Amino acid sequence: MQATPAFQRGNAPAYSPDQVTFNPQSPLVGKKIAFLGSSVTYGFEAKGKSFVDFLAARDGVRVTKSVISGTTLAGRDPAGYLVRLQSDFSSGDHYDLFVCQLSTNDNRHGKKLGTRTPADQRTNFDCNTTLGAIEEICREIPTKLGCPFAFYTCLQDDPARRYAELIKELYQLQAKWGFGVIDLFHNQGLLASTAAHPNAMFDDVHPT
């Protein structure tokens, strides 16, 4: 994969976080932001460097990055989101924000979408489903970490509309749990930019 033109050109040295100029006036300087995710947050086709590393380099964000490619929201796999949420983040770190990637892997691995629970239900979620796992994350972050949190969506070719359906459900859960949504999937400016710069994406999901 790494021999492809998109990988080589998109990961040219000029695009490394090392080449970014630090902005001391950024409102994010010194903020502590935790990231939980999979391949996009890791930088799977970008030599392990993602937007998280650019936030650290350009804006002086103090990042904690828990990422394993191919992992899912749903389930209790040792490498999965729910287990890493417990093991990789500490209340003593006093995060300013927690950001969770809305994984594209749940559909790919055949995880059940599940159903949203009533507005007054705050425990006992079916964590073997994607929506149940999301609600467990929503319960856990305020309880364990006591900070605001947000989910971000990914780019993906989605002819079956399964990821789009998950995003629709995410917005419904936002009303219950009060988290932010950074919606890249529906961001027309980003879609136009990646179309104009094909080497910016290795495939439909992963940036270079």
Predicted ranges, named:
Residues Q101-N105, E135-E169:
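Active-site segments of SGNH/GDSL-like serine hydrolases
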Residues V29-F35, V40-T123:
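Conserved SGNH/GDSL esterase-like catalytic core that processes O-acyl groups on lipids
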Residues R62, P148-F149, G180:
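Proline-centered loop/turn at the N-terminus of a beta-strand
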Residues C154-T208:
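Catalytic His-Asp segment of secreted/periplasmic serine-dependent ester chemistry enzymes
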Residues A3-F35:
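Membrane/wall-proximal cationic-aromatic binding patches
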Residues L55-A56, I141-P142, L173-Q174:
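A generic structural signal for well-ordered alpha-helical segments
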Residues F51, R84-L85, T130-I137, L166-L170:
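A general structural detector for well-ordered alpha-helical segments in enzyme core domains, enriched
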Residues A119-T130, D204:
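A short acidic, glycine-rich active-site loop
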